[in-house]
Amino acid sequence: MRWPGWLTLLPGWRARLRVLLPLYIATWLAGYCALLGLGSVSSDPELLTITGTLMTLGFILSLVLRLASIPRRAILLLLGCVGLVLGLLQLRQFTVSVPGSAAVAPSILPALGFAWLLVILSYTLVTNDWLLFVIPLSLAILGLSGTENPNPDMSGYFLVFAVASLFAVSYHNYLRYVPVQR
């Protein structure tokens, strides 16, 4: 398998990937369970597709940026530039609609806002502490969407969320005490 040239130049990136991947997967799973919970109360099928895809791409990009040792300030600047471009595109279209907002009950709008915050945040997860911030946002999304439509699916999403969150917090604590190549 041939890797990109800039990735092979980093010393020890495979060992770092092996150490960081379980934490990224566990927090991604916790966030995705929240999006699934929101998708179960929304009648818009595109909402889960768009938010899930963007969040997954954000997690992958964050992991690659972390392996490449890109400074956090550069990532925030990049995120700000992308947000500015997207904002200008929205102004050009003279629309303020967010995918999913038309098909969601008014009581779910805060959960929808948290879901989009989770999607934006997924592009900046370059430290272990930032990764753990996915858990409270996901819990808020699950709680807000679970009060609107309590169904058996929500119990399953919460169970998977709880297991993934417990693993992420435990693994984060493990990484604090084990010397890791950073």
Region roles according to the model:
Residues 1-182:
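Linear, non-domain "peripheral" regions
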